Amino acid sequence: MTSATTLLELCDLLDANDILVSGIPEEADANVTGAACDSRCVRKGNVFFCKGRAFKPAFLTSALETGAVAYICDPDHAEELTTTAPSAPAIVTSDMRRAMALVSAAAFGRPDLDVPQVGITGTKGKSTTAYMLSLIHI
């Protein structure tokens, strides 16, 4: 699923949740089509999350070469990553886990809103009914 989310909209989202430290890159109108935290999974138009204990700046370089439009990092790594990729749009957040949840949902077009919900109640037959419903792909 693709979306029309931009870097500016992602920065606004993080700011509205009080976790934006710095951001709003010059390329604020760049379209974001997804998000990834593994440089091997980055696609053109993705935002790349720089996180984890084993994170290496080479992962950011690889993600940008693959087509990442920007990266998101925490304040502890911001200076080092700015040195690694000085021309890349950077967004710095105070809460990486929350940012990953918010940005991923927005970048992928909120697929969680398209999940059908079915309630099955009663004394007997709930498991059978649930199984039968799963087979007809509601």
Located regions from the model:
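N-terminal leader/targeting and accessory segments in enzymes
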Residues: 1-102
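Phosphate-binding loop of NTP-binding sites
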Residues: 98-137
